[in-house]
Amino acid sequence: MGKLLEKKNKLKEGEMIQLCYDEAFKIMFANSKHIEILTMLLSKIFKVDYEALEGKVELLSLKVSSKKIGEKKCERDVVVSIKHDEIYNIILEVNVKKKFYQSIMNRNLYYTFQTAGHTLIEKNTYDEMPYTFLINFNTFFINRTKKEVFEEFVLQDKYGMVLSDKYKVFNINIEECYNLWYHNNYQGKFESYEEDLVLLCASLMVSEEKEFNSILKMIQMKPEIKELMEGKIREMNHDEKLVTEYRTWKDENERINASIINEERKEARQEGLEEGRVEAKKEIVLEMYRNNISLDMISKCTNLSQEEIKNIINE
């Protein structure tokens, strides 16, 4: 029993806690002592120089208090205010559970409007309302037709007339960013800020410290910020309580993603794919691997040996 617990609270050599784990995301980006990390991320999202936001970013409370009896409590991942010409309140949410994406999107929109209401100062007019932006780091496209890595939504009517510019929703598909980085298929497709953002978002998905450090080297940022981020990763990797919680989260997420992929396999078979077809199995293996599902779980789902799986991955 003791050995089992010891294994649960320690990472393998070279492994790291993924930043798409919401607690790790908060530790990295919702840290008032090292606000420069979050400032750098926001500068890439909003396509401005780091210096334009330096000293203007302030973390807000993650919890919204309410006196209403029975009102659902909420705690956001990161909430920040930027005072730059206007006031911008920004909610950042990270999620990798594809199965519940609609429910999660509804929750995040609720957070957005609730935050806007709680930050309206009594003496201000409604014209003076802060801008409130929601930034989702997800593993899916909202618009499945366009399939854009960076999606942007505003309140508008069916003819395209904007109802209010005070609210915006950004959806960033971090899994697609990871795939673009992994296959070295991002260069020349984006402008410099977006290219850096693709790499930053890819870094949220990696599970090896070597890969994380390699990605950071490719991103334009101050050396001291890079060192801070690398230091934060090392701290988290040696936090046994956090590692235990991360492993529980990862196991659950693997089960959810594996069940989704199994459902997709059944649908594919119904459309005429035979169970034993090599190409079909290869695609399933690669899809599960890209979703950071363990070799053991892939083996159970595909009936392939771990050696066969490694050969497919390394082809």
PLM region spans:
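Generic preference for flexible, low-structure residues
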Residues: L41-I45, E54, E58, N108-Y110, ...
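Generic detection of long, well-ordered alpha-helical segments
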Residues: E15, N31-E36, F190-E194, I219-K226
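Short amphipathic C-terminal alpha-helix that caps PH/PH-like domains
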Residues: L42, N108, T112, L197-L204, ...
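Accessory alpha/beta interaction modules
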Residues: M1-F170, E175-L180, N185-Q187
